[in-house]
């Protein structure tokens, strides 16, 4: 059995400043502390995350979060075995703030420095919480990303498909903005949809008529915009029932797309011949109740185990970064002072870029 390791994790890739301490012994892990300082109030007036504001907030808060995480864990820097930090992908200003702090701590203490792919942090969370064995199928669904991955190792992922445009979380945020709901959009739309009729509006289920596991959500967002504008033109505004029905219809369409694409991904994953096949979901959108329920049903029908992290570990956090750093460190991964912040960092570097990735290639 590998020796116990205690790592500090640092996360600053979007609008959550976070630090955590995780101790691992073999396949067992314990989160000794997890501090998340969100920036929702800073960005609320803008209807979305403003990169410059986010970067400044990270620079102001990161050292305080690290101090709190160590204090809550009852440890000092001398008690750690390493420092893990999100090195990408993400908003470059925030990622850079985290990387520079981690470098300074590593240089000052002599501790190993491990750069972590933010998405690997999400994808490896089921191993932190449940000790899930490789290989497993992962649906990574968040504000900026959506892809199906077969996780074979701490740094070995095979992408089966992903969104060619908007990620579901981004679509939820834009839907909330279009309907005048507060950010972040995911919880707001889900709460509003609870009292709505999902059948009132015939929203599309994009790309279900095409084979494979790729997805698209920008057309769904456009359909909602047109439905909203039609109601405004007809009535002069939206009632509470209109908003609830629009949210319910939008959410039902997202659920249907994710459920059907998951069925297809499970068919590809079956060829892996895993001894204990499992489907896991991670990322901020994994906190959505109807999405979890639909994926649970899909997994049960396929006869595979379904795992979803606790809600506090679905959204961005540093515990997953500390754990992913431990996993990478155990596999021989370690970085020096040349570690750089990366706005783009695909998990499966051998996979072709998805349509819509742009000239610079895949972001993740």
UniProtKB/Swiss-Prot annotation:
Cellular localization per UniProt: Cytoplasm
PANTHER family, A to Z: TRNA N6-ADENOSINE THREONYLCARBAMOYLTRANSFERASE, TRNA N6-ADENOSINE THREONYLCARBAMOYLTRANSFERASE, MITOCHONDRIAL
Keywords assigned: Acyltransferase, Cytoplasm, Iron, Metal-binding, Transferase, tRNA processing
Function as written in the Swiss-Prot or TrEMBL entry: Required for the formation of a threonylcarbamoyl group on adenosine at position 37 (t(6)A37) in tRNAs that read codons beginning with adenine. Is involved in the transfer of the threonylcarbamoyl moiety of threonylcarbamoyl-AMP (TC-AMP) to the N6 group of A37, together with TsaE and TsaB. TsaD likely plays a direct catalytic role in this reaction.
GO biological processes: tRNA threonylcarbamoyladenosine modification
Positions bound to Fe cation: 118, 122, 316
Enzyme class: transferase
InterPro entries, sorted: ATPase_NBD, Gcp-like_dom, KAE1/TsaD, TsaD
Main location: cytoplasm
Family assignment from sequence similarity: Belongs to the KAE1 / TsaD family.
Transmembrane segments: none
Sites where the protein binds substrate: 140-144, 173, 186, 288
Cofactor (UniProt): Fe(2+)
Species name: Cereibacter sphaeroides (strain ATCC 17029 / ATH 2.4.9)
Gene Ontology terms, MF aspect: iron ion binding; N(6)-L-threonylcarbamoyladenine synthase activity
Protein name: tRNA N6-adenosine threonylcarbamoyltransferase
EC number: 2.3.1.234
GO cellular component terms attached to this protein's record: cytoplasm
Cofactor: record remark: Binds 1 Fe(2+) ion per subunit.
The reaction(s) this protein catalyses: L-threonylcarbamoyladenylate + adenosine(37) in tRNA = N(6)-L-threonylcarbamoyladenosine(37) in tRNA + AMP + H(+)
């Amino acid at each position: 059995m590998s020796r116990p390791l205690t790592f500090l994790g640092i996360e600053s890739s979007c609008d959550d400043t976070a630090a955590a301490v995780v101790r691992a012994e073999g396949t067992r892990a314990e989160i000794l502390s997890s501090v998340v300082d969100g920036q929702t109030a800073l960005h609320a007036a803008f209807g979305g995350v403003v990169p410059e504001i986010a970067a400044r907030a990270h620079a102001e808060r990161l050292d305080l979060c690290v101090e709190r995480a160590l204090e809550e864990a009852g440890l000092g820097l001398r008690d750690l075995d390493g420092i893990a930090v999100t090195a990408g992908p993400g908003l470059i200003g925030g990622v850079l703030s985290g990387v520079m702090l981690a470098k300074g701590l590593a240089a000052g203490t002599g501790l190993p420095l491990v750069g972590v792919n933010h998405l690997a942090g999400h994808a490896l969370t089921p191993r932190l919480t449940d000790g899930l064995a490789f290989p497993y199928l992962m649906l990574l669904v968040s504000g900026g990303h959506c892809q199906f991955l077969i996780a074979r190792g701490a740094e070995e992922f095979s992408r089966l498909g992903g969104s060619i445009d908007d990620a579901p979380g981004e679509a939820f945020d834009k839907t909330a903005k279009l309907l005048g709901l507060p950010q972040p959009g995911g919880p707001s739309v889900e709460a509003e949809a609870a009292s709505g009729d999902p059948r009132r509006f015939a929203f599309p289920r994009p790309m279900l008529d095409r084979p494979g596991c790729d997805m698209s959500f920008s057309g769904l967002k456009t359909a909602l915009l047109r439905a909203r504008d039609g109601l405004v033109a007809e009535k002069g505004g939206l009632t509470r029932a209109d908003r609830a029905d629009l949210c319910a219809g939008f959410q039902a369409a997202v659920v249907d797309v994710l459920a059907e694409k998951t069925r297809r991904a499970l068919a590809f994953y079956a060829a892996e011949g895993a001894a204990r096949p499992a489907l896991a979901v991670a990322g901020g959108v994994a906190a959505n109740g109807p999405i979890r329920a639909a994926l649970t049903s899909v997994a049960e029908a396929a006869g595979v185990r379904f795992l979803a992290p606790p809600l506090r570990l679905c959204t961005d956090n540093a515990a997953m970064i500390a754990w992913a750093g431990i996993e990478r460190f155990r596999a021989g991964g370690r970085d020096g002072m040349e570690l750089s912040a990366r706005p783009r960092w695909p998990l499966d570097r051998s996979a072709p870029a998805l349509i819509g990735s742009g000239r610079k290639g895949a972001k993740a």
